[in-house]
């Protein structure tokens, strides 16, 4: 497929999240423990060597976000009138196109086909689309820049 071809893509979950968080909440994820259990055909061999990493990147589906409420324009993050209107791609809202989430979280342990993680901001039953080991070489090499409102927004997130 050429990069200019547009169309629908299908993905399938590779695992499911089990967590004490049953609903999306915007803050206090730092100490939330969760497990990710792989679905067939993936098994413990798919996780071989992952336990040598301290963190993983988890790509998941915001499955409870209403597909008909997806934001495409500007809005104030969390509806806060003190913050500027910004486009959906300038924020990390749940009701985004394709409803895809990405989280870097601590890998606590690997048991068979199950990962124990901490600070994964996904709720119970969340479909996991992919898992990647976090490697510092993929972190930005330049100084990270972000607007002041984003620091305020994230102050209590983790």
Task: Describe the residue ranges of each PLM region.
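Glycine-rich, low-complexity intrinsically disordered segments
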Residues: 1-158
């Amino acid at each position: 497929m050429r990069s200019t071809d547009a169309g629908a893509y299908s993905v399938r979950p590779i695992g499911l999240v089990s967590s004490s968080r049953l609903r999306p909440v915007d803050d206090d994820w730092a100490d939330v423990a969760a497990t990710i259990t792989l679905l067939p055909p993936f098994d413990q061999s798919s996780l071989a060597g992952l336990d040598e990493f301290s963190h993983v990147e988890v790509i998941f589906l915001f499955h409870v976000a209403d597909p008909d409420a997806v934001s495409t324009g500007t809005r104030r993050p969390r509806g806060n009138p003190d913050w500027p209107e910004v486009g959906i791609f300038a924020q990390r809202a749940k009701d985004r196109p394709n409803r895809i989430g990405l989280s870097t979280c601590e890998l606590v342990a690997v048991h068979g086909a199950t990962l124990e993680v901490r600070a994964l901001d996904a709720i119970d039953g969340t479909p996991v689309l992919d898992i990647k080991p976090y490697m510092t070489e993929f972190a930005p090499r330049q100084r990270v820049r972000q607007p002041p409102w984003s620091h305020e927004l994230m102050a209590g997130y983790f």
